[in-house]
């Protein structure tokens, strides 16, 4: 059982040994060793770096291979052309390593592109460039003449900074009869020379002896140094001073303050007087120790006068001499050990770093390479390095005391744009010391964010009739990226509206996102537009986002109310509404119907009576437009009532339209016709003066034109007569070409072409000049033209029709109570209310409309000599052009209550033949047109 356990332990040890060797091999694989003698010239070859790194020489500069040195002086350099490591200056091994036997310089080789560190160790080989030397120029030794043979006297030590065989190897004493040389070993391996008395001295024979001490090294060639020694023979001094200890040992902390006592040596001499007084001094003291320690020659107290540094000198060995007044002395050794204290804080050196890193770089990206050193030893020199935990970075130890700072996760510039990384190094001393350094890192932007609109959708409003180029709305998209990646441009999608490209309606400023109208919008055409605004950044590749924008057109009060009923006829005539004199207050006469193309309150319509020939007789519904009687009709109320109705919307500013209504007030049709004659005579008197002026003006123009024609004709005849005379005198001449002037017939045609007609009607305030119209004033009206006259409406007492037609047309037709119309002239129904027993009121809408037209026409033709109205009061003739000029397909029938009492005429829809001969209308009224009533 025990054997098995031993075998298992051996197997484990073997496995651990293999692992250790593998690790050691991997460690050493990155360690490069070279050697170079000291004092070589600058640029001397040290080693082939490119070969040891496995790179071509031209790759060294490309990959950023460089030496990382912690010292102030760069002793080596890399030759990029040859790929060699060369010396960069003077190398003195004694200055670098002093008395250390093996001198190694360590440096690191950094490959920038991979951030790999390679250790390079260069051994400085010593050469024999220093000869042994003594500190004293001359040494004096006092020896009593009673000194017995074998007495030893200390001699000064020589110093050689070289090491090894080149260091101090031996001493030689010049030949003499009294003294010899012996070497005594020291604890550090060095040897002190001593002078040994070989025979008795006689002061009386020779008071002093001169000797030469020579020190030799082992170099090739051998170097040596010498110091003269003068031995003075003294009178009798029986006792030699004796130190209490042969060796004094003391440990001193390196941070001991200056002036502190280290120890006190003491030597006693039993002699009396001056021979018993001991004086203390250092012997063979090195210069470095003499700068730090001092010895009180009277008391033997050793003090510190300089500063100790464990990192430079850890141990001092000094020899102290005690000499009495008679010249006898003795020596002792003082060993001072410097104790390390944690007086050096760690040092952090940034070997390589980058100041910017692209966001979204993968974790593990190297940010910096740093080296941590502590000059202390032991735990005081053990250093740990760390960074704050909340940062997205971490430290990894690579080679020796090197660390690399890497990212631990993906960085986001939009969250943090830069980092101030604090690197802290702390040793394990008591108390621990620490050092800090900072690495500034900027996060470079990557186009990883599209533009973002603050809202998911937008609504914009623009009033209609806007000016072109008007600013409608402004959208803004934010891109959290920076620089070009955050430069946003705006555009619209390629859509169509009612088959028209969207770009013809609106445009957007690509830089500001302001939306502009390219044309004036009309609310009545379309009321809204759906747009999609695209925001695109300038990154590579560009990122974009879009948002919907609803553009609503706001209605403006740009349409005045449009009156549908009563419609304005194209020939300028007006319709007539009928109101019976027996109508009660509130009787519905007609209704004004209007619409407004706008919407909302811009389309709310109000009706009001703007003007009336008889104020207070009629009223208009504010919201309905119904025209009703406001009071009972009186006999004194005029037959013809004119009303001006205004229709106004509620827009800002309000728009309005007006319509003129003519209302005939009568109880019977004969009464209506009788009153119309008197009305026309009044109108005739009002316009007689104006008509006279117009006739005079036309006559004057005609006379001037006639004179012009006569002159033109005379000139033409004169030229014609002259040409005939020329033809008679020159019979051989060829015929003249046809003249370009017209003859008499042409003049007649000219006159016919430029003739004019003055048409004066009773209700017109101006004359109508009709051009061009042939003048047939000099011809008779044919029977055919009479037969083509317009149909007449014959009442019970028909008048004789004036004209130039057949006399049979002047015969009066027998009385008939039936009104007869052609199908094209049949009036519509204006009401269904019957009159009295003597007549029948029209019972359909079209009859009533025709009746209204006839009443207005009769009033217009009263003053015309060729009027078809004449004879009795019960006779009336109307041209077919005075028929209804409006349609009521959009207007409900509000005229069913129209009633004219006292009429003895009966209207019928029958299209039967008229009793008696059909009357024929005169041709004189063919060119006359009824005019609208003036207020």
Curated annotation (Swiss-Prot):
Extracellular side: 30-693
Compositionally biased tracts (Polar residues): 807-844
GO CC list: plasma membrane
Membrane-crossing residue ranges in chain numbering: 694-714
Biological process according to GO: cell adhesion; homophilic cell adhesion via plasma membrane adhesion molecules; nervous system development
Membrane topology, from the record: Single-pass type I membrane protein
Signal peptide region: 1-29
Cytoplasmic topological domain: 715-935
Region (Disordered): 805-844, 905-935
Compartments it resides in: Cell membrane
Protein's job: Potential calcium-dependent cell-adhesion protein. May be involved in the establishment and maintenance of specific neuronal connections in the brain.
Protein name per its UniProtKB record: Protocadherin gamma-A11
Organism name: Homo sapiens
């Amino acid at each position: 059982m025990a054997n098995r356990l031993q075998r298992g332990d051996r197997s484990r040890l073997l496995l651990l040994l293999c692992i250790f060797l593998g690790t050691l091999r991997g460690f050493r694989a990155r360690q490069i060793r070279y050697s170079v003698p000291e004092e070589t010239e600058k640029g001397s070859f040290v080693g082939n770096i490119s070969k040891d790194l496995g790179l071509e020489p031209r790759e060294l500069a490309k990959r950023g291979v460089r030496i990382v040195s912690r010292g102030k002086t760069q002793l080596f350099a890399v030759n990029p052309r040859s790929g060699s490591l060369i010396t960069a200056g003077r190398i003195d091994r004694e200055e670098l390593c002093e008395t250390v036997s093996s001198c190694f310089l360590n440096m690191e080789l950094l490959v920038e592109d991979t951030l790999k560190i390679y250790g390079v160790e260069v051994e400085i080989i010593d050469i024999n460039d220093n000869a042994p030397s003594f500190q004293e120029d001359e040494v004096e030794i006092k020896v009593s003449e009673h000194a017995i043979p074998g007495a030893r006297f200390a001699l000064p030590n020589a110093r050689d900074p070289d090491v090894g065989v080149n260091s101090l190897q031996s001493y030689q004493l010049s030949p003499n009869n009294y003294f010899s040389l012996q070497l005594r070993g020291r604890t550090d391996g060095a040897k002190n020379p001593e002078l040994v008395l070989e025979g008795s001295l006689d002061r009386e024979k020779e008071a002093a002896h001169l000797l030469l001490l020579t020190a030799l090294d082992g170099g090739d060639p051998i170097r040596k140094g010498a110091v003269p020694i003068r031995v003075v023979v003294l009178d009798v001094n029986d006792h030699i001073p004796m130190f209490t200890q042969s060796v004094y040992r003391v440990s001193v902390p390196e941070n001991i303050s200056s002036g502190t006592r280290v120890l006190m040596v003491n030597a006693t001499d039993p002699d009396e007087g001056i021979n018993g007084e001991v004086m203390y001094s250092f012997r063979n003291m090195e210069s470095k120790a003499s700068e730090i320690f001092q010895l009180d020659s009277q008391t033997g107290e050793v003090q510190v006068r300089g500063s100790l540094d464990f990192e430079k000198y850890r141990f001092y060995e000094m020899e102290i001499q005690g000499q009495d007044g008679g010249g006898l002395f003795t020596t002792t050794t003082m060993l001072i050990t410097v104790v390390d204290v944690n007086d050096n804080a760690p040092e952090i050196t940034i070997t390589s770093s980058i100041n910017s890193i692209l966001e979204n770089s993968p974790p593990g990206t190297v940010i910096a390479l740093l080296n941590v050193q502590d000059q202390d030893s032991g735990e005081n020199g053990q250093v740990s390095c760390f960074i704050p935990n909340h940062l997205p970075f971490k430290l990894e130890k690579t080679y020796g005391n090197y660390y690399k700072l890497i990212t631990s996760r993906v960085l986001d510039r939009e969250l943090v744009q830069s980092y101030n990384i604090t690197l802290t190094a702390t040793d394990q001393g008591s108390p621990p010391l620490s050092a800090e350094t900072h690495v500034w890192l900027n996060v470079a932007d990557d186009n990883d964010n599209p533009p973002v609109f603050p809202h998911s959708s937008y609504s914009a409003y623009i009033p209609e009739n806007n000016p072109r180029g008007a600013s409608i709305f402004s959208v803004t998209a934010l891109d959290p990226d920076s620089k070009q990646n955050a430069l946003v441009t705006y555009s619209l999608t390629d859509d169509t509206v009612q088959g028209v490209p969207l770009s013809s309606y609106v445009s957007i400023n690509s830089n500001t996102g302001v939306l502009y109208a390219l044309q004036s919008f009309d609310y009545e055409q379309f009321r809204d537009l759906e747009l999609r605004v695209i925001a695109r950044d300038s990154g590579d590749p560009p990122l974009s986002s879009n948002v919907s924008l609803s553009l609503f057109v706001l209605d403006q009060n740009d349409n005045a109310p449009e009156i549908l009923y009563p419609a304005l006829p194209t020939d300028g005539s007006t319709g007539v509404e009928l109101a019976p004199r027996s109508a009660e207050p509130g009787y519905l006469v007609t209704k004004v119907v209007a619409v407004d193309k706008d919407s909302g309150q811009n389309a709310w319509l109000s009706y009001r009576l703007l003007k009336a020939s008889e104020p207070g007789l009629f009223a208009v519904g504010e919201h309905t437009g119904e025209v009703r009687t406001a009071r009972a009709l009186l006999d004194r109320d005029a037959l013809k009532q004119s009303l001006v109705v205004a229709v106004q919307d509620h827009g800002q500013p309000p728009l309005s339209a007006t319509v003129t209504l003519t209302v005939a007030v009568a109880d019977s049709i004969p009464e209506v016709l009788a009153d119309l004659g008197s009305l026309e005579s009044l109108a005739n008197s009002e316009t007689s003066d104006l008509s006279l002026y117009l006739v005079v003006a036309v006559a004057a123009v005609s006379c001037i034109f006639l004179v012009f024609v006569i002159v033109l004709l005379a000139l033409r005849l004169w030229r014609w007569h002259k040409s005939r005379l020329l033809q008679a005198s020159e019979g051989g001449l060829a015929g003249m070409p046809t003249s370009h002037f017209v003859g008499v017939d042409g003049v007649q045609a000219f006159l016919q072409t430029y003739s004019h007609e003055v048409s004066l009607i009773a209700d017109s305030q101006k004359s109508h000049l009709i051009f061009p119209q042939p003048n047939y004033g000099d011809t008779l009206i044919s029977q055919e033209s009479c037969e083509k006259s317009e149909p007449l409406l014959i009442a019970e007492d028909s008048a004789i029709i004036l004209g130039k037609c057949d006399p049979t047309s002047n015969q009066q037709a027998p009385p008939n109570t039936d009104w007869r119309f052609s199908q094209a002239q049949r009036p519509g129904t204006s009401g269904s209310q019957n009159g009295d027993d003597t007549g029948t009121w029209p019972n359909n809408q079209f009859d009533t409309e025709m009746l209204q037209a006839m009443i207005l026409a009769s009033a217009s033709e009263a003053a015309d000599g060729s009027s078809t109205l004449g004879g009795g009061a019960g006779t009336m003739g109307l041209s077919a052009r005075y028929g209804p000029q409006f349609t009521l397909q959009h207007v409900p029938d509000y005229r069913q209550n129209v009633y004219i009492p006292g009429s003895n005429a009966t209207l019928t829809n029958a299209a039967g033949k008229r009793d008696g001969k059909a009357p024929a209308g005169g041709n004189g009224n063919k060119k006359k047109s009824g005019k609208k009533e003036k207020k």
